[in-house]
């Protein structure tokens, strides 16, 4: 087991603290990663990486989240990057079983501005789900603007005779 130290790490000039001693990662000999990391900073930025220890069916079951990352801080330190502001948050879940893989991710930016021009609230997400016996996979995506869904795309990937085909 790997315990992350110190108790209040400084990352990118920001002081974090672990919530309720949630500061460990464990790599089992079967290559499954177990984790319980919950870090918050003084300005609300958070990072979480957690696995379900009670899940005995999946080979891997992991959630990762980054919340309230201030884009303005990034554009101030990267040369030639356009001036962006807003709060970026993202969450992803990865579940792997012996026969299938499921992935979902969502990201949003609240109050996005680009070169001091208001853009709005932007959100997007995607989900990849297994189908019948690994021969079919489903994809669902969306894009939102100011909390209204403005675009969706769904797809089905099928395999027949070793060749993949999108519907």
Segments from the language model and where they lie:
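Interface amphipathic segments
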Residues: 1-167
